[in-house]
Amino acid sequence: MTKLIIISAPSGTGKSTVIERLLTDRELNLHFSISATSRAPRGEEQNGREYYFLSPEEFRRRIEANEFVEYEEVYRDKYYGTLKSEVERILKEEKNVIFDVDVVGAQSIKKYYGDRALAIFILPPSIEELRSRLQKRGTDSMETIKQRVDKAEKEIGYAHLFDLRFVNDDLVTCVEQIRKAIAQFIAK
């Protein structure tokens, strides 16, 4: 039976890199679940590659039609969510689904799929290390970094709700630990 792998973590913990590396492991047979959003595409983004881009009206219509496993309005008329049809498409291909979602979305997906889903939370070694990583990126203002760190502290408060937790203090080690945990879960 195909399984669902939910990955959640604060910004700056290496979640995207961990997921990219896991996707290259053929034995895990993972396929990335593309989220839907009502925000406009940025730069080179294409519909169906980075996101499914929907108008706010279309997003709300699909919410009313119960077409989402989970969704959230992060700002006024700026929605993000996971379409049931996207998950079903991947499962029909006999692949395991991997999600990159926030803590609220992770809990919704876990509740919907139950024991068929494994919820993993990636923690930074410390809040100080997280702040340092975000500063080294050089992409955010100090105010944005403060907001991300504040949000991370709140998200870490949800870590106990996840099936497994891993600290990313060494990327290679963290990826290998998560890979082993996923392989064991898939083999059940």
UniProtKB/Swiss-Prot annotation:
Top EC category: transferase
Q: Which residues form the Guanylate kinase-like domain?
A: 2-183
Q: Where in the cell is it found?
A: Cytoplasm
An example GO CC term for this entry is: cytosol
Q: Which Pfam families match?
A: Guanylate_kin
Query: Which PROSITE patterns did the record assign?
Result: GUANYLATE_KINASE_1, GUANYLATE_KINASE_2
Q: Which GO terms describe its molecular function?
A: ATP binding; guanylate kinase activity
Quote the catalytic activity from the record: GMP + ATP = GDP + ADP
InterPro entries in alphabetical order: GK/Ca_channel_bsu (IPR008145), Guanylate_kin-like_dom (IPR008144), Guanylate_kinase (IPR017665), Guanylate_kinase_CS (IPR020590), P-loop_NTPase (IPR027417)
- UniProtKB keywords: ATP-binding, Cytoplasm, Kinase, Nucleotide-binding, Transferase
Q: What does this protein do?
A: Essential for recycling GMP and indirectly, cGMP.
Q: What is this protein called?
A: Guanylate kinase
Q: Which gene encodes it?
A: gmk
